[in-house]
């Protein structure tokens, strides 16, 4: 009698860039991509995995880029936080459409739209079987959504953080530009930091390293890859302390 495989991780945080929701578009959201990702989150939810999500806003707005063109950085970052909220609401709607209970929480107060991020309440939502989408980054300028994801992963006591990218892991150099790029199966946060491998910004890496938070970097453009990763298959690159 065959036994049904069980997920390796009980509670996870999925970090997606805003660009992951664009598909082949140059801007905005591709509903087909959003719906596919939502369905994969549904499968994880039905397998008993507690899922927290952090989504960037780069498909709609990048505060750092406008700051380079003269806009005050704080203003640009606040606008970027609102872009993450827009993406979070899109994912919330896609999940609700397929019957997944979900709560969007925000580091900025927008009470008419969603509840504020309160750590204990967010953990309780996860324990009750709700997917939790954390919007607006850390609520502070000068911090990336990678930093926000690392912070939330640590605060919510997840078993591992999963970073969705457009390549199937971390390489010695950009595999889209260099044919001799070699993929890492696993590596330490210190090596990622020392070799400047572009996994995440330094703040994010140090937070994960110091709090022994495992990170799995995988290719979100491959259908079902997040499910395989959470179930412990040999997917992507594992980064560890």
UniProtKB/Swiss-Prot annotation:
BP GO terms, sorted: 'de novo' CTP biosynthetic process; UDP biosynthetic process
Annotated compartments: Cytoplasm
Gene3D superfamilies listed in its UniProt record: Acetylglutamate kinase-like
Pathway terms, separated by semicolons: Pyrimidine metabolism; CTP biosynthesis via de novo pathway; UDP from UMP (UMPK route): step 1/1
Major location category of this protein: cytoplasm
GO terms under cellular component: cytosol
Regulation of catalytic or functional activity: Inhibited by UTP.
Alphabetized GO MF terms: ATP binding; UMP kinase activity
Catalytic reaction list: UMP + ATP = UDP + ADP
Pfam families associated with the record: AA_kinase
Residue numbers binding UMP: 57, 77, 138-145
Keywords: ATP-binding, Cytoplasm, Kinase, Nucleotide-binding, Pyrimidine biosynthesis, Transferase
The keyword Cytoplasm is assigned to this record: yes
Major enzyme class: transferase
Bilayer-spanning residue ranges: none
Binding site for ATP: 15-18, 58, 62, 165, 171, 174
Function in brief: Catalyzes the reversible phosphorylation of UMP to UDP.
NCBIfam families: pyrH_bact
Subunit note: Homohexamer.
Family annotation (PANTHER family): URIDYLATE KINASE, URIDYLATE KINASE PUMPKIN, CHLOROPLASTIC
Family in the record: Belongs to the UMP kinase family.
Record's protein name: Uridylate kinase
Protein source organism: Dichelobacter nodosus (strain VCS1703A)
Lineage summary: Bacteria, Pseudomonadati, Pseudomonadota, Gammaproteobacteria, Cardiobacteriales
């Amino acid at each position: 009698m065959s036994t049904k495989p069980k997920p390796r991780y009980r509670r996870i945080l999925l970090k997606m860039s805003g660009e992951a929701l664009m598909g082949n578009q140059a801007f905005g959201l591709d509903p087909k991509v959003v719906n596919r990702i939502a369905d994969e989150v549904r499968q994880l939810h039905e397998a008993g995995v507690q899922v927290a999500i952090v989504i960037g806003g780069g498909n709609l707005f990048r505060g750092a880029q406008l700051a380079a063109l003269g806009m005050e950085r704080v203003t640009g970052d606040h606008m970027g936080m609102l872009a993450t909220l827009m993406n979070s609401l899109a994912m919330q709607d896609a999940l609700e459409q397929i019957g997944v209970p979900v709560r969007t929480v925000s580091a900025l107060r927008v009470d008419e739209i969603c509840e504020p991020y309160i750590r204990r309440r967010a953990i309780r939502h996860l324990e009750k079987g709700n997917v939790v989408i954390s919007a607006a980054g850390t609520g502070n300028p000068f911090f990336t959504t990678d930093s926000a994801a690392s912070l939330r992963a640590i605060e919510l006591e997840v078993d591992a953080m999963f970073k969705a990218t457009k390549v199937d892991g971390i390489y010695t150099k950009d595999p889209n530009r260099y044919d001799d790029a070699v993929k890492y199966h696993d590596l330490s946060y210190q090596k990622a930091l020392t070799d400047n491998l572009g996994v995440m910004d330094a703040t994010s890496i140090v937070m994960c390293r110091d709090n022994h938070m495992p990170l799995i970097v995988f290719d979100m453009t491959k259908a079902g890859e997040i499910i395989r990763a959470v179930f412990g298959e040999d997917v992507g690159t594992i980064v560890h302390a």
